[in-house]
C-alpha cells in the first residue's frame, strides 16, 4: 500500500488555514516528500506520521513557496537525533539553492545526498521509491514527478517445475536474481507469472498543460495538480505559467487517471470560496485538496 498526504495546498504565501505546497508519500514504512514550503515541518507534526523514516525530498522547482521550509525541516530532523543521510533531488541549480538555505543550519548531524538532475525526462530509484521525472514549462526549470510502487509478478510453482528449476533457487529468482549452475542459467521469468499493475501517483505544480504531461500521468491512481485559480483567469496563468483548475481537469480526463486532487491555490482564493462544481463537469472525480488530506492506495488483484 502507498499512503499519500497533501501536507500543504497553498501557493505563493501561507494562510491561517493553509500551509504552502508539499506532499508526503509513505511506502513500505519509508517516506518521500515533494516540495517543502514554509512551515512544512509544522504540518508534518500535525499529521503525526513522524520524521524518522523520511528518506527523500524532491523539489519541483526553486521558487520560495516550494523550498523555504527546508531549513526548518532540517533543524527539526537534527533535533530529533537523525543520523541517516537525507537524499534531496531537484532540477539544475540544486546545490546552489541548498547551500544558500542551509546557512542557518550548518550543525545538522546528518549528511545531505544531493542529486541534481539534468533538465530532461528520466527515471531513478532511491530506496523504496521508483521516481519518474518530466520537465514542464514554468518561469524557471520545473519538474513533474511520478512515484510508483512496483509489484513483483506472482511466483508460479508449476512454471518453475516445468522449467526444471531447482527448488533451492526459487527464492533468489523470485527476488529478481539470475542464478548460474553447471553452465545453465536460471532467470526470474522461468518462475514468475505475468507483470502485475503497481501503484502510480503523479504530482505537478506550477506549469502550463502540455501533451507530454498527459502521457506522463497516464492511468495514474492519483494525480495531484495545481489549480491556481478556480475561476477563469487564463491570461494571468499564461503570463506566470500556471494552470487553471479546469485545465488540470482536462489533463486528468485525457490521461485517464482515477482521481484528481487540486492543490497550490492562490492566496486570493480562501478555502471557503473554492467551488469546483464546474470543474467536476469536466472530470467528475475531482477533489479540492485540503491540508493533511490523506489517501491509502492498495494494489489491485
What are these regions (language model features)?
Residues 38-89, 111-121:
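Active-site metal-binding motif and surrounding structural segment of the metallo-beta-lactamase
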Residues 69-76, 98-101, 270-278:
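Metal-dependent catalytic neighborhoods of phosphoester/phosphodiester hydrolases
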Residues 34-37, 54-62, 90-91, 202-207, ...:
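Active-site neighborhood of phospho(di)ester-bond hydrolases with catalytic His/Asp-centered motifs
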Residues 5, 89, 113-118, 132-134, ...:
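General small-molecule cofactor/ligand-binding pocket signal
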Residues 93-105, 114-119:
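A gly/proline- and charged-residue-enriched helix-loop-helix capping module
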Residues 15, 129-203, 207-216, 222-224:
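Active-site-proximal loop/helix segment associated with metal-binding centers of metalloenzymes
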Residues 1-47, 85, 145-147, 193-204, ...:
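Conserved beta-strand hairpin/beta-sheet module of binuclear metal-dependent hydrolase folds
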Residues 120-121, 210-301:
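Binuclear metal-ion centers of metallo-dependent hydrolases, dominated by the metallo-beta-lactamase
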